[in-house]
Amino acid sequence: MQYLYIFVGGALGALIRFCLSMLNEGSTIPLGTFVANLLGAFLMGSIGALSLSLFKTHPNIKKGLTTGLLGALTTFSTFQFELVTLFNQHHFILFTIYGVTSYILGILSCYLGVKIGGRFS
């Protein structure tokens, strides 16, 4: 049964990811990946905090949300590829800003998600 939850979550995450990737069209800045990864970090923190109480009795829902939805939504490999592309195109300032802000804001988003999710658990 857990595979069904992961499958459905993955389909939803992939669809959201695809829609966000349209923000990248015609732009040097990979905004879609940036938004997807920050949103995913925030939601992972929230779900992680909520799982302490809410998902104890529903572990399949947690797997569907984390492994399925957020696994398909976020993408480390695309992020790395975009960084390499920016570097190869000699966009060194954008490369640095995108890399540094993605990591710092990703950690802060996850932290904020943990704090907010913890209030509801």
Curated annotation (Swiss-Prot):
It catalyses: fluoride(in) = fluoride(out). GO terms for biological process: cellular detoxification of fluoride. The keyword Cell membrane applies. Na(+) binds at residues 71, 74. The keyword Transmembrane helix applies. Signal peptide: none annotated. Na(+) is not transported, but it plays an essential structural role and its presence is essential for fluoride channel function. The chain crosses the membrane at residues 3-23, 29-49, 67-87, 92-112. One of its GO terms (cellular component) is plasma membrane. It holds the Pfam family CRCB. GO terms for molecular function: fluoride channel activity; metal ion binding. It is found in: Cell membrane. Keywords: Cell membrane, Ion channel, Ion transport, Membrane, Metal-binding, Sodium, Transmembrane, Transmembrane helix, Transport. It is a multi-pass membrane protein. Belongs to the fluoride channel Fluc/FEX (TC 1.A.43) family. PANTHER family: FLUORIDE EXPORT PROTEIN 1-RELATED, FLUORIDE-SPECIFIC ION CHANNEL FLUC 2. Fluoride-specific ion channel. Important for reducing fluoride concentration in the cell, thus reducing its toxicity. This is Fluoride-specific ion channel FluC 1. It comes from Staphylococcus epidermidis (strain ATCC 35984 / DSM 28319 / BCRC 17069 / CCUG 31568 / BM 3577 / RP62A).
